[in-house]
Every structure is written in C-alpha cells, then in structure tokens.
Amino acid sequence: MSIPGLGLIPEKPATSASRTYTLEPRQEYRFSVSHGASITITLTRGTAERDGTELALNVAYTLSGVKSKILSWHGANLSIEGITDHESVAGPDDAANTAHLNLHAFLQRSREAAARNNGGGRSAPHGPRVLVAGKTGCGRTSLVRTLAAWATRTGAQPMVVDADPGEGLLTLPGTLSAAVFGTVMDVASEGGWGAAPSSGPSAVPVKLPLVFYYGRRRVEEDRDLYKGVVNSISSAISARAADDPAVRSAGMLIDTPPYVEGKGADVLIHIAEELNVNIIVTIDTPSLHTELTQRFSGVKNVLGEHVSVVALDKSSGVMERDEGFLQHMGEASIKEYFFGDAKITLSPFTQQVAFDELAIYTSPEASDYSAEPGALERIPQPLPEMAHWVLAMMDAAPNDPPHKIRYAPVSGFVYVAAVDKERRRMKILAPVSGRLGDKPLVWGKWPEPHINLLG
C-alpha cells in the first residue's frame, strides 16, 4: 500500500523473483541495478517510457548497471524479473514530469515555426538551442535525453550535444560529442542513448556522433583546453546544421558539465555563446539561475535572439550515482566499444606494431607546459606505463602541426595491451583491422586504466 501523503509504494529489498507492478497514470517505477546483475522489464498493458523512449508492448528489455525509471502517463502493467538493489513506485505528485512536458511543448512550437520558414537556405531560421545546467546529480542528462526522445517521436531530428567529458554520448568518456537523433533510442542500453558505433550489427539504428577528445575528466583540470574543444565541436555542428534544414529547424539540446558553486558559470557561458544558445534551463540551482539571468539580461546571441533563462525543480526520481558506480559505467563503455555487450559480441583485432611506425602524442608536463592551450608533444620512445590505456585516433595526418591534431575530430580508439620497451614494439587492440600509422594517436590523462581488457 502507499505511504499516506507521499504516494509511494515502500521500497522492496533486492529480489530475483518475478513480480508485476501496476502503474496508475503518471506513476513511475524506479529501480537501481548494480553492474554484474540484470533485470528484465516487459510492458504487458498500457503505455510506458524510459526517459521519453516508449517501451514496446510484450517486448522484454534487459538492463544492467543502471539507475533509472519507467514512467507511465496513462497507466501500465510491468512484469519484472531479476535482481535490483532497490525498487519502488512513485507519483503522481512529482511535478517535474509535467514541467518537462510543458517545456517540450514550447520547444516543439518553436521547431514547427522554424520548419515553416526553412526554405531560405542557410539563412533560414534555427530551431531552439537549449542548454541544460545544474549541479552533479540534478538530472541534467536525463532531461536532455527525455527532450530528445520526445522530439524524435514528433518526427524532429534534434542535434544532441554532450559537453560533459565525465561520461560520453555514443562514445567513450573523456570526450565531447554531438549526434543527430532522428530515430528511436535504445531503451535497454546503460545510458539510454544506445551504443557507440562499432563494426557489429545493431537492433536500433546507429547514430554516428561527431567526437572531439578532451582526455580529462573535469573541466577545471584544463579550462583553456576544454574551451578550445568546445570551439572545435561548435564549428563542426554549425557546418552540419548549415547543410541540413531538418536538423537546423529541430534545434539543439546541450548537456553540460556539472556546475561547481562559485567557479563553473564561466564555462557554461562560453558553451552558450559558442553554440548560440537561446534557452538556458537550470535545474535546482538558484544561485546559478540568478547569475545567468543577470549575465544574459538584455543580451542577444549572434543570431539576434534574446536568451531566456528558465528554472526547473529537480525530479524526486533522480538517483545519486557514486564514484564507484560511475567508474563501472566508464569501464563498461570501454569493454563494450571493443568487445560488444550481451546482445552483440564483437571481435577486435590485435596487432603487434613497431613503435617507430606510430605517431603518439601527449600533453607536456605542467612544468614544461606551453602557453598555447592544447599543446602536444610527440612521445620519442615506448613507455611501459602506456599499457592498458585507451588512445584516441585523430582525423589528421601524423605530421600535422600539434595544434591541428589536438583539435581534430576523433576517428576511433585503440587500446594498448602491452609495451615492449626493449624491442620498441606495442601490442594494440583496435575495433577494425587497418594500418595504425596513418593517423596520429593522442594519449590523454583520463579515463585511467583500471582494467586489463585482455587479462
């Protein structure tokens, strides 16, 4: 039964028994599944969605290593099998879902207005460009994913930008990325977006992201480099939107790094200005809302639009993810990139490569650091400490200037399985076969090598 006044069904302990939940209109099934465990969710009646993406009726979805929720607007029955850390049913008193739906309706009207006037070529109007900001654990990513899913259900093709290097949108952590979403997302994937592009088949249409390499976890580790990467992805996005009226009229949804009280607003302002944002959404962060409102009051972006700053409350369904959980997520994404997941098994290629055939770059140490943001230096000899690191393969020539290499798009990633310093050889794991010396490789500072993929 519900707890009086809260509309909550008490949390149940971890269980592997089959059970059924009946969701009344606007109720949510909230659950947490650890890495190594899994649950299977089947919608047996009604309609329900995970972060905006609808579940198909009588289709079993298996999820592992997630903290998430299933929302039903009109009522549903869910059949659950497997082990959860905890689970509960909540609602319908969480006003955040209604606020999110109202925001979507406003954005959709803006998209439709832009689409009606998109016959003017590159000068045609843009759809809404929305930046979502807030502290760690406020639900930024969940809101962006939900808005993107709802947009695709109307036939729109929004550009989704992940400016938070801590996770990775359809790619590995330590990157900034962007992708056009015009088809359904993968309900069963850990992040809810889908898997990174690979050489294997996919049950859900694959999205091909634009990826740029930061190689650090937090913005404050190298603000100048981070801003330079933002500039690079902004240029690539602008070119993509200029050539595609459907993408331009659908607008943009931007997930941002977590706001740190007192020192994070300048980065958010830089992102907003570079990507010509006209709507900023702050979640449960009054001080940030006040600062951004003051900063953009009376200010127009380069497209001549005023910038609106909107405050939303945090959903009660947002679950905290601790450091251990996030580390497991990062490790899982790396394993999945090379080896696939439970649904698709991939067979990466292992090569023994002469070090001198490769062009591997890294950032200079702090004491030698160039004044130029994003400086790189070529590594002159194989280093044993490179073992078990993931290197970014850049879309550039090996002898291009370091600045051009650093801010080039990423073509893919390789994994250093072993380093033989004496013989000057390296054992490299790559998702596809091919020469590795044709593209420069960049060795970042994160994600750190917590796992041995071949061990």
UniProtKB/Swiss-Prot annotation:
Signal peptide: none
Residues binding ATP, per UniProt: E28, K67, G137, C138, G139, R140, T141, S142
Subcellular location: Nucleus
Record key words, sorted: ATP-binding, mRNA processing, Nucleotide-binding, Nucleus
SUPFAM superfamilies: P-loop containing nucleoside triphosphate hydrolases (SSF52540)
Pfam name, any one: CLP1_N
Recorded GO MF terms: ATP binding; polynucleotide 5'-hydroxyl-kinase activity
Region (Disordered): 112-131
InterPro entries attached to this UniProt entry: Clp1, Clp1/Grc3, Clp1_C, Clp1_C_sf, Clp1_N, Clp1_N_sf, CLP1_P, P-loop_NTPase
One cellular component (GO) term of this entry: mRNA cleavage factor complex
Gene Ontology biological process: mRNA 3'-end processing; tRNA splicing, via endonucleolytic cleavage and ligation
HAMAP family according to UniProt: Clp1
Function: Required for endonucleolytic cleavage during polyadenylation-dependent pre-mRNA 3'-end formation.
Subunit-level organization: Component of a pre-mRNA cleavage factor complex. Interacts directly with PCF11.
Recorded family membership: Belongs to the Clp1 family. Clp1 subfamily.
Protein name: mRNA cleavage and polyadenylation factor CLP1
